[in-house]
């Protein structure tokens, strides 16, 4: 195998390469030798034709080098070892290379699922420029002529070193030549002397002498030696029209010819170059890699969307790719829309079920089935908690989807601005816009920086507000409101940051300028209309304040009602004691008279002291009873005023809720009309799906409002019917049932009195006195029972309207006590009535006998 040259220079092409170099060294002056030594340390593309040649590599070394997504270390090591066997140092080609790593990085494009073949694919009628190739034979005159035509400032008798130095300076100035083009300077064995010389007419393909893009796309010279690889897509996009780019992509995707002559081995690159290229490929931005790799991708090996960015971007190279991207977005957001609609339907079901349970509860209370009413109340409370957690919300106003739609609107606005620029430059507005993500990257980076700064500032502000809340309790409500506002802003900023990495440019780029304008206007109209519908979990502030006042009044009603009940109990106890004392006093007076008539003066003295103590006790109890009655009357008046305030606030809340529901209904109807008009001319599949979900949510909201209105109208109609009945029968008191209950013991007392009167006339004085005391006691008890029944009836109405279960249970116990008292009185009256009738009959019979005897 031929030996290698100094500093890792490759061996000569043939066996006479060494002698030729030796002869050249002897013939050249010392200055030329010095230049030769200096040139030997230069990169390959800057060396002259008299310098050490580059040996041919074996076919094993020329194997295609593949790396899917990165450089393979095993293949790099294999290529490096084979290169050293041929006398090549893989690191020698990169010594003092004027091309930086950043310049080499964009040339490497990795496509997932495909293998990148590094090599030159020769096209028909093209050749690589001889300026950057090593002459392998004596036919270098054409190359010198082309070099003279390319750079008129250089003379034909200039040395190769000066020419190459000038070329190196131009490479440094341009800064866009890929490193692979500068460092790969080997010739394949199969395309050496066998390749015929290219005719001179092929030189006319170059239109620009200094375009490195044009030079890198040329074909090999007489020996077919190629230096470089296709230029970066960024350089081509600035110098070629879209038609030329399409033709070039088609030629790249065409069938390959002889792989030995048309593919360049990449095994001469060292591990350091591989690492640099891999690092640069990792550091490059994802949109740039995607845009660069799209023209080089095989039709059958197109990469799919990244699962982490599903719905955020796609391949905009064809209509099928566009539909695939929209389908991905639809698959991502359809579950969100479905969940929102399910929550709306569930809330409507909860509202309907609550109305039915309330009706059943009212029926149970009317039928005195309080156990059923208690069970229904528990179910109603559970439904109320579920209603609070489930609130109506437009799918398009859902936080994540609303943020995404805002991001889409921003992308559409950016595309519109670019389309306006293209329209001003005379481009066709109906053709899809070819977007360049690199132009939008600075704006995205700036907005990202601003959002992060804004979020940090908001977080600091929130912490400061928390400290102020702890220090200043007096300003708690104001600071909490501000804290809520900042929290919402933080959530909005975080939602905006969520879409910073989501590039919709490929999708937006598929729409024409007219379609972009329609989508932008539709987004603005629908977002503005949806913002007018107050889809919140709780009503407005005015209604909430009134509801809080009603709650406080309800608590006051409970407290006052409890006080009135306690005072009534105390009054009843005091009356009972006073009645007992009044029952004992006549008996003590009679006993005192008998003691005095029987000359039992010590007994009469004791009875007098007993009568005096009972009298003083009765006076004290009567004073206390009068005070309790005054206090009870005050509480009753206060209870009446609180009930009036409660009813007034209830009416005001109902009025506010009616107005609020009316406004919501009107705004919802307007939004539904807007959605129906937009759906007819919608060009965006995602927006069409979102608007359909919004339309369904609006229909559910209208149905729930109609259910509530129907329930309210039924309640109003029932109240009107009750008022009509009361107005049609004025002699009948409003509380007829309670009056009947109140009159029942009085009727019993009157009947007892009517039956008792004859017996009183016939009986003696002692019987008359006992009957009088009994009748007075029973009359007072009946009067107390009547008052108690009236009070219980008022409390029962209050409990029914306020759904106060505690008060209902208390009233149940009170009614049970009244029933027991009435039953005891009836049992007490029956024996007295029978005894009085028997005594009256006996006395009458005795009187008749005496008269007959007389």
UniProtKB/Swiss-Prot annotation:
Residue ranges, annotated region (Interaction with ATF4 and ATF5): 598-854
Primary site of residence: cytoplasm
Coiled-coil ranges from the UniProt annotation: 366-394, 452-505, 602-666, 802-830
Region feature (Disordered): 1-24, 179-205, 221-257, 278-323, 716-739
Renumbered residue ranges of the record's region Interaction with MAP1A: 1-292
InterPro entries (UniProt xref): DISC1
Required for localization to punctate cytoplasmic foci: annotated span: 440-597
Segments of this protein annotated with the region Interaction with NDEL1: 802-835
Bias (Low complexity) ranges: 296-309
One GO cellular component term: presynapse
Alphabetic keyword roster: Chromosomal rearrangement, Coiled coil, Cytoplasm, Cytoskeleton, Developmental protein, Isopeptide bond, Microtubule, Mitochondrion, Neurogenesis, Schizophrenia, Synapse, Ubl conjugation, Wnt signaling pathway
Skewed-composition ranges (Basic and acidic residues): 285-295
Subcellular location: Cytoplasm; Cytoplasm, Cytoskeleton; Mitochondrion; Cytoplasm, Cytoskeleton, Microtubule organizing center, Centrosome
PTM description: Ubiquitinated. Ubiquitination with 'Lys-48'-linked polyubiquitin chains leads to its proteasomal degradation.
Annotated stretches, region: Necessary and sufficient for interaction with PCNT and localization at the centrosome: 446-854
One MF annotation (Gene Ontology) recorded for this entry: identical protein binding
Entry comment describing in which tissues the protein is expressed: Ubiquitous. Highly expressed in the dentate gyrus of the hippocampus. Also expressed in the temporal and parahippocampal cortices and cells of the white matter.
Amino acid composition bias (Gly residues), ranges on this chain: 1-18
Effect of residue 822 to P: Impairs interaction with NDEL1
Connected disease: A chromosomal aberration involving DISC1 segregates with schizophrenia and related psychiatric disorders in a large Scottish family. Translocation t(1;11)(q42.1;q14.3). The truncated DISC1 protein produced by this translocation is unable to interact with ATF4, ATF5 and NDEL1. Schizophrenia 9: A complex, multifactorial psychotic disorder or group of disorders characterized by disturbances in the form and content of thought (e.g. delusions, hallucinations), in mood (e.g. inappropriate affect), in sense of self and relationship to the external world (e.g. loss of ego boundaries, withdrawal), and in behavior (e.g bizarre or apparently purposeless behavior). Although it affects emotions, it is distinguished from mood disorders in which such disturbances are primary.
Assembly, per entry: Interacts with NDEL1. Interacts with CCDC88A (via C-terminus); the interaction is direct. Interacts with GSK3B. Interacts with tubulin alpha, ACTN2, ANKHD1, ATF4, ATF5, CEP63, EIF3S3, MAP1A, NDEL1, PAFAH1B1, RANBP9, SPTBN4, SYNE1 and TRAF3IP1. Interaction with microtubules may be mediated in part by TRAF3IP1. Interacts (via C-terminal) with PCNT. Interacts with CHCHD6. Interacts with CCDC141. Interacts with FBXW7, the substrate-recognition component of a SCF (SKP1-CUL1-F-box protein) E3 ubiquitin-protein ligase complex; the interaction targets DISC1 for proteasomal degradation.
Functional description taken from the UniProt entry: Involved in the regulation of multiple aspects of embryonic and adult neurogenesis. Required for neural progenitor proliferation in the ventrical/subventrical zone during embryonic brain development and in the adult dentate gyrus of the hippocampus. Participates in the Wnt-mediated neural progenitor proliferation as a positive regulator by modulating GSK3B activity and CTNNB1 abundance.
Protein name: Disrupted in schizophrenia 1 protein
Organism whose genome encodes this protein: Homo sapiens
